[in-house]
Amino acid sequence: MFFHKKDPIHTVKIDEPNPRFAQLLLEQFGGATGELTAALQYWTQSFHCENAGIRDMLQDIALEEFGHLEMVGRMIEAHTKNVDQTEAYKSTLFAVRGVGPHLLDSQGNTWTASYVNEGGDVVRDLRANIAAEAGARQTYEELIKLSTDEGSKKTLVHLLTREISHTQMFMKALDSLGKLTDPMFGNIQPDN
């Protein structure tokens, strides 16, 4: 069902490795609004969705998020692997765990499935996804501001751009259901 294509959609090229920046990147690898969370959230939601078009969209975006996870992982690896290990170990997380990506956020908290937000209702899930993409975008914007490496910035801008595209896709799906601006979902109407 899956094929790992060796040619990335966007080439990750780091000009100036910085292990401390790699620690910040862990937020998008093993953090609550990171790529692993998004991929698993959208993939799981797809099995609850009876609308074939929206199910396919959720699975397509989930697979793209796995590609983003790979890009972030390669960035973390490049920022930690090819530098003086004294520098890498100045970052506490890499001193304890070793170089490269880990299922941790930037503060060392372990990734948990409780980050995955799925509820079995397509409208609820699409709204949760729009919020999740907003969290990812905010994190990418902050990482771009903090990065001093042009190669890192290019990859982060690419990832930010794709998150915006995902938000637009989720909004279009909600609109197709007539629920983009409707605050209600479900079948029970509130009392007057």
Where in this protein do the model-derived segments appear?
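Non-heme di-metal
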Residues: M1-N192
